[in-house]
Amino acid sequence: MATVNAICTSCGKTVEVDNQKDAWVCPYCSTPFVVIKAINRYKAQHKDVARKVKAVKKHSADFEIKDGVLVAYKGSAEEVAAPAEVHKIGENAFENNTTLKRVILHDKVEVIGGYAFRGCTALEEIKFPDDLKDIEGWAFRGCTSLKNVVIPPHMQRIADCVFADCTNLVSIEFPECIGEIGAFAFSGCKNLEVIEIPKYVSIIGKYAFSGCEKLEKVVIPERVSVIEECSFANCTALSALGLSRGIKSIGASAFQNCVSLRNVEIPAGVLSVDGFRGCTGLRAFTVPPGTTAIGDFSDCTNLEQISIPASVKKISGGFTECPKLLNIAWSNLAENAVNFPAYYETVVASRKTAGKCVYCGGDFKLISKTCKVCGKKKDY
């Protein structure tokens, strides 16, 4: 009698059998089974276990792991799953890996470190675990094959430069709890077509979406008070812009070169309006009452008219290269006419030639040489 291990084909328990017999009765479930089948089942299962152990050992050799942090990946596989003991992907762990196409992160991974996947130009897909809490700065910058990203539900911020220059990124889905989108977060994502900024976002950093050339619509939520410098600059397809009542300031070049913008409605309560330089699609622009400062509108080559409230006393920028801008409604225009070159060179020059007041076009009193309309003294 030669006793060997087998697995009962009925209950799955491991039992010892006589390999010379044709049949055996399981001592656990009292069910008879064919001996050769039970022996083969045992061999197959343990062969598979051995193969998996071998694969894990081989796979593990590609990883450098310290205290649960995946410090470095040294392999060249196209698909990688994080080992079970990993709770953080360390800084630079996969940086500039050009063979990696797919990454699977298990539920214990809570943090992806800075620069972790930067320059992984072949990376097409990454599945984030639901419990992921943070993706640090520059983590996926330059992942030019990445097309779709779904941010997991517990993340509260998008760090600086996280997805910058992901030139083939088409869509990004944010969870509602996101409160901050960092500087340069999606800068240079020239194929990004759709974004829906969550209602709890209060900060959109500078250059956050600059160079997103296919982005057509943006709605800024109520909690955002400042649109930072160049946040949406060079979004050349942007044609629909919704600005909330919570906005107090539009920063320098915030919408620079958004050439598809035709109409922009600035809500009341905005104190400073800047950022529309090079918006060649604008024909008319109204600055709301209460605004105290406006900035640079130069290179708005098709702008024909602008309305500015009396609360604005001076302008810090200019309207150079606005050749069509002749219709200006502003009570303080007289003191600032030089900032409107087209207006100054045509309207003011013609008034001088006609002997009229350069400020309002009125006639002068004969003796005092003061304007009968605005009271300004003739100074030319």
Labelled PLM ranges:
Residues 5, 23, 354, 368:
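Residues immediately within or flanking Cys/His clusters that coordinate Zn2+
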Residues 8-11, 26-29, 357-360, 371-374:
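Short cysteine-rich clusters marking metal-coordination/redox-active sites
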Residues 16, 34, 363-366, 379:
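Short functional micro-motifs and their immediate structural scaffolds
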Residues 22, 38-58, 341-347:
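Short, intrinsically disordered terminal segments enriched in charged and Pro/Gly residues
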Residues 30-40, 375-380:
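Short Cys/His-rich micro-motifs in 6-15 aa windows
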Residues 57-66, 74-88, 98-111, 121-134, ...:
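Structural signature of tandem-repeat unit edges
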Residues 91-93, 113-116, 136-139, 159-162, ...:
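Consensus positions within tandem repeat domains that build extended binding/scaffold surfaces
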